């Protein structure tokens, strides 16, 4: 087995590696934002509506009354609202994602499994999207299965994709020079000697150490040296490049296809064409990272796949117990679960209920998706500047965003209060205003949550703790989809959705406030423990 020094000599990160990583983000963006975010759900809902019956009597075909609430018979006496179909399929997909994340995270670390699994997921996801788009309307059950496959394989591939960057950073050659894409990676790379000789803190001492040294938890902590601060800024910029490439490519595709959809008067054939183009784009641009880029083989195992699966589940359980024993991580993971749940609920309901309840056209929904992407990208650029201007840390930014995000559903609920009948979300213009406001804080919520968590994770245990972070985030998504399925299936009143989102998005505030109080008076935690 190769030692770390031998691996470092044999493998060296180049600009091509990083460009391949960014290229994947350019390919995945249109699939996530346009295809999976808007067009695939619309195709499935349209097919479900064609096979459904009015919700009021379950006998009159929905095709005769396209604007009335519609239900679909699943089996026997079980009926489900058409808008709930996508939520239910997404809930099944998210549950499968959580189950697979527990095992695949460990398997990817052995041999070349990371590349193989990534490319397999991209191929299956791309082909599933194309088949879903062009299959006949009578193939409704098959479309739902392919919807689950597209969503499942995209999320799993995204998890594999995220794991490439730490490897590129660790094996980048250490040189000194001006700040470029290369030097940014070089600055983020740890010194090889410290990588080899690094020792981790005993688990019983981790929490006191975090409280004493983390600037997130203790504002009076010893300041980090200039190099560490510089490296943190460079890491944030690199993350922004990937995030910007992801949304930038989606915006470019929306600029191309939105006028086409408008010129063809919302011709439904544009939807499968767009999904096909996005799927092929994702497959083509993922090829360099999956096939050409080679990584060092750091871990070997002669164990069978089933043994690796068992060990990975066991390791994930111990990681969960370990994380829950550290109060700061426990509090933040609780906050992250509900923040992600609120975000996912708001974005999903904007598209699905915009179509089902407010009868937004495909063109309007495409514009809405473009607005979300554009404002999310705008927020990613502006929020860091505001953070530096007001000298805020990452935890304070997350708190502010968590306070502002519930304002959108609160505005929607306002229209149901006597005396405010003209307010609320009642027209397409109202949907655009509320969603764009929400979209502006979308990028900041995700990036700053990741930044806070990165400063809480014990040294030497980053991989397993970030796998837990992804698992908690997906738990929030699962909770969102199940809740929306139940709400939309039992009531057509949007007040239930608004109230649910407000409650979910205010729950994290108490945990974030406790963490903030620890940063002001770190001894408070020790005296209470």
Curated annotation (Swiss-Prot):
Membrane topology per the entry is: Multi-pass membrane protein
Q: Name one GO biological process term.
A: amino acid transmembrane export from vacuole
Q: Name one GO molecular function term.
A: L-amino acid efflux transmembrane transporter activity
Pfam families attached to this UniProt entry: ATG22
> In its keyword annotation, does this UniProt entry include Glycosyltransferase?
no
Per the record, what is one GO cellular component?
fungal-type vacuole membrane
User: Which parts of the chain span the membrane according to its record?
Assistant: 25-45, 72-92, 130-150, 241-261, 269-289, 365-385, 397-417, 429-449, 467-487, 496-516
Primary subcellular site in the record, as a coarse category? membrane
Compartments where located: Vacuole membrane
Sorted keywords for this record are:
Amino-acid transport, Autophagy, Glycoprotein, Membrane, Transmembrane, Transmembrane helix, Transport, Vacuole
Q: Which residues form a coiled coil?
A: none
Q: Which residues are glycosylated?
A: 198, 218, 299, 359, 489
Give the family this protein belongs to, as stated in its UniProt record: Belongs to the ATG22 family.
What does this chain do? Vacuolar effluxer which mediate the efflux of amino acids resulting from autophagic degradation. The release of autophagic amino acids allows the maintenance of protein synthesis and viability during nitrogen starvation.
Q: In its UniProt entry, what is this protein called?
A: Autophagy-related protein 22
Originating organism: Schizosaccharomyces pombe (strain 972 / ATCC 24843)
Gene this chain is encoded by: atg22
């Amino acid at each position: 087995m190769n030692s770390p020094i031998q691996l470092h000599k044999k493998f060296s990160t180049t600009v091509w590696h990083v460009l391949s990583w960014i290229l994947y983000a350019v390919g995945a963006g249109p699939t996530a934002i346009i295809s999976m975010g808007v067009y695939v759900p619309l195709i499935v809902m349209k097919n479900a509506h064609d096979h459904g019956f009015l919700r009021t009597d379950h006998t009159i075909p929905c095709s005769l009354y396209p604007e009335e609430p519609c239900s679909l018979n699943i089996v026997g006496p079980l009926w489900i609202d058409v808008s709930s179909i996508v939520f239910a399929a997404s809930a099944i997909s998210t549950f499968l994602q959580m189950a697979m994340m527990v095992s695949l995270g460990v398997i990817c670390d052995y041999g070349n499994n990371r590349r193989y699994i990534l490319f397999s997921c991209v191929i299956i996801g791309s082909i599933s999207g194309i088949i879903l788009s062009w299959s006949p309307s009578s193939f409704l059950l098959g479309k739902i299965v392919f919807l689950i496959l597209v969503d499942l394989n995209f999320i799993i591939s995204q998890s594999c994709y995220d794991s490439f960057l730490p490897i590129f950073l660790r094996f980048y050659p250490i040189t000194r020079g001006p700040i470029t894409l290369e030097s940014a990676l070089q600055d983020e790379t740890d010194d090889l000697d410290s990588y080899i000789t690094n020792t981790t803190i005993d688990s019983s001492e981790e929490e006191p150490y975090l409280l004493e040294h983390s600037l997130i938890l203790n504002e009076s902590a010893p300041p980090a040296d200039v190099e560490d601060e510089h490296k943190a800024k460079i890491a944030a910029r690199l993350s922004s490049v990937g995030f910007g490439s992801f949304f930038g490519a989606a915006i470019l595709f929306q600029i191309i296809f939105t006028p086409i959809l408008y010129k063809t008067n919302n011709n439904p054939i544009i939807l499968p064409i767009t999904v096909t183009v996005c799927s092929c784009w994702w497959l083509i641009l993922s090829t360099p990272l999956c096939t050409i880029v080679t990584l060092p083989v750091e871990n070997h195992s002669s164990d069978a796949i089933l043994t690796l699966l068992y060990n990975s589940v066991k390791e994930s359980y111990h990681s969960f117990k370990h994380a829950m024993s550290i109060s700061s991580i426990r509090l933040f993971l609780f906050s992250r679960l509900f923040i992600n749940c609120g975000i996912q609920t708001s974005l999903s309901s904007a598209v699905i209920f915009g179509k089902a309840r407010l009868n937004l056209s495909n063109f309007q929904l495409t514009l809405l998706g473009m607005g979300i992407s554009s404002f999310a990208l705008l927020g990613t650029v502006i929020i860091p500047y505001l953070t530096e201007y007001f000298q805020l840390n990452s935890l304070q930014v997350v708190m502010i965003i968590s306070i502002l995000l519930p304002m959108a559903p609160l505005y929607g609920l306002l229209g149901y209060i006597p005396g405010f009948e003209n307010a609320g979300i009642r027209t397409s213009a109202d949907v655009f205003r509320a969603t764009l406001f929400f979209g502006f804080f979308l990028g900041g919520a995700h990036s700053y949550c990741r930044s806070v968590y990165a400063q809480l994770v014990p040294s030497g245990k980053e991989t397993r703790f970030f796998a837990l972070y992804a698992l908690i985030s997906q738990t929030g998504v699962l909770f969102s989809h199940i809740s929306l399925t139940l709400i939309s299936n039992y009531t057509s009143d949007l007040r239930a959705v608004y109230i649910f989102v407000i409650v979910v998005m205010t729950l994290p505030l108490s945990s974030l406030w406790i963490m903030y109080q620890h940063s002001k008076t770190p001894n408070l935690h020790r005296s209470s423990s």
